[in-house]
Amino acid sequence: MKIAIGYHLQEGPWGGGNQFAQSLAAALRDHGHQVCFGLRERDIDLILLTEVRGRSPSASFHAGTVLRYLQFCNPRAVVVHRINECDERKGTRHMNRLLRRANYVADHSVFVGSWLRALPLWRRGAASVI
């Protein structure tokens, strides 16, 4: 299986998202999967959307890029949206809107906590809490 992780790996200390992406990529490769960090390849089986802020230096793609990929390259790719952020967590006023929009391209949502899943923001499609 070919899996695209929406994260630009960073060298050195960069935070939890970077550690998550590095660990996930290593585990997937150990299990025989191919891992890429962009949407240039036409035969991606699974897209992991990890960052909704398009201008973030850690984002290798965002929801708009995923939507274009599904429309013009590979409509069979499955999209999983990893959600670990919200306005309530940091007192911001923009993340919920970005997350809600991005969530529309997802076939499945993975929440890092049940408290995130309980917020009235998400499509009520397939979801998991880790």
Name what the model sees in each region.
Residues 15-19, 61, 92-95, 123:
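Short aromatic-enriched loop/helix-cap "lid" or pocket-rim segments at secondary-structure transitions
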Residues 36, 40-105, 115:
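Extended catalytic core of nucleotide-activated donor transferases of GT-like folds
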Residues 22, 26, 100, 118:
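Active-site phosphate/pyrophosphate- and oxyanion-stabilizing loops and adjacent acidic/basic residues
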